[in-house]
Design a protein with these regions (language model features):
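Conserved N-terminal segment of class I S-adenosyl-L-methionine
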Residues: 1-79, 96-97, 129-130, 140, ...
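Short phosphate-binding/catalytic loops that engage adenosine nucleotides
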Residues: 56-57, 107, 151
Length: 166
């Protein structure tokens, strides 16, 4: 297991802030404790879930290896996060269909992953050389999925996408 993320690692918390910061306006629109969230692919240390709980979001966690609780996949959520996990999906269309069920109407799907910029740069891209990275997405891919499945999409950082379900 190569995961080195921990609750005490301020650098990791700052890294996750790239997802948390653009979610803050959405969180502030709701009463403290009323939002329900799911950290999908939380890993062994669900730091983002903890950070969201500090903001008043009631969080559940799911990870096929570290938090394999299928019952949390049977409800819908105001916020679903998927940080540094989607690139590991061997059948991303399956998880995407699940995301469409998990995100409540008006809810937000927040994804963090490096995006493909163009074919030429992909050839020399270090990110694809990680053998566990098997799925890659571009801005155009997320725009297509958003249009097809009823989301408004924004790109608040080079590796963050927010999709708000209409």
């Amino acid at each position: 297991d190569l995961h080195e993320n921990s609750f005490e690692d301020e650098g990791y918390r700052k890294f996750l802030g790239k997802v948390l910061t653009p979610l803050t306006p959405f969180i502030k629109d709701m009463k403290f404790g009323e939002l329900r969230g799911l950290d999908f692919g939380c890993g062994p240390a669900p730091v983002l879930a903890s950070m969201l709980e500090e903001e008043g979001v009631r969080m559940n966690m799911y990870d096929p290896f570290y938090a394999h609780n299928l019952s949390v996949l049977e409800q819908s959520y105001d916020i679903v996060t998927c940080t540094e996990a989607i690139e590991h999906f061997h059948a991303p269309h399956v998880e995407w269909a699940l995301f469409n069920k998990l995100v409540a109407s008006g809810g937000v799907l927040a994804i963090m992953t490096k995006r493909v910029l163009d074919k030429a740069r992909f050839a020399n891209w270090h990110y694809k050389n990680d053998v566990t990275h098997v799925s890659f997405f571009s801005e155009a891919t997320f725009q297509y999925l958003a249009q097809r499945d009823g989301y408004d999409v924004t790109f608040p950082a080079s590796d963050v996408v927010l999709l708000r379900k209409r």
